Amino acid sequence: MQSAATVPILEPRKVLKEFFGFDGFKGNQEAVVNSVLAGEDCFVIMPTGAGKSMCYQLPAMMMEGTAIVISPLIALMKNQVDNIRGFAQKSSLAHFLNSSLSKAELNQVIEDMLSGETKLLYVAPETLKKEETIDLLKQVKISFVAVDEAHCIS
């Protein structure tokens, strides 16, 4: 993960409770979150269910701009976005961008991105290569980029 954004004064534990409903961190999550908030590059290896996603989701909610999350599976993207929207109760905070979107859904993603409301954007690797995606991302402030699955890297 790489960061170039400024961090507001919010306390990570308060945001953890507000957006995700958790009272505390698991394992090394807090150290990773603090590193991301400090603008440090991070490489995180955790087993399934250990809370890797929180390591980028929480900083994204706290930082200025939109975090780009590269994720290979449409179902995983949808699940992550649905979970965030469920706690935050604001659909514009998280979106995914992939081939499953209708034209109306795509237009809503673009509108929310350009308005600065979107904090997390999940993107499939093949979508990230498209010229229209690149053009959209050039118009928004990107807080950092996270690669959610190692097999997205080659």
Each predicted region: which residue ranges?
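Conserved pre-motif I regulatory segment
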Residues: 2-47
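Loop/turn-to-beta-strand initiation segments
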Residues: 41-42, 65-68, 117-121, 141-144
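Conserved nucleic-acid-binding Ia/Ib motif block in the N-terminal RecA-like helicase ATPase lobe
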Residues: 67-68, 74-130
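SF2 helicase catalytic motif II
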Residues: 118-119, 127-129, 133-154
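Walker A/P-loop
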Residues: 39-58, 68-73
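Short hydrophobic/charged patches on amphipathic alpha-helices used for structural packing
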Residues: 33, 57, 107-110, 134
